[in-house]
Amino acid sequence: LDDEVIEDDFALVSMCNGRYYGGGFMPVAEARMDDGVLNTLVVREVNRRTFLKFVGPYSKGNYHKFPDYAQCYTPQVVHIHSDKPDIVTCLDGESVVNRDVTIKLSDKKLNFFGPAGCSCNRTARAKGPELNNL
């Protein structure tokens, strides 16, 4: 993480430049696309039972309720090295097997245009009786 090295066994590492991924998961509620940091949540290796208890709160951004094994950092560069040959990395829905992964925020930015009042940092809310059953 930038110049800091953390050596441990991890069950999960989520690098977030936005709030949501994969069907509404929000691992780091404070992640923003426009703040210049890569919110990186590291979850230490835990037993299956503990991990299953963690998934619900993780999906809602409540990792902070588990400080013994979940910490969030805000680096600009993340390098992950694994001694195991079968580490699976998912990047925007694409899975790759690799031992070394480096993720860095780009200095180059993209401008997005949207309707008035639209923000990449807001949460969409369903309104109306026909949307309540989604």
Which role does the model predict for each range below?
Residues 1-134:
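Long C-terminal subdomains/extensions of small-metabolite kinases
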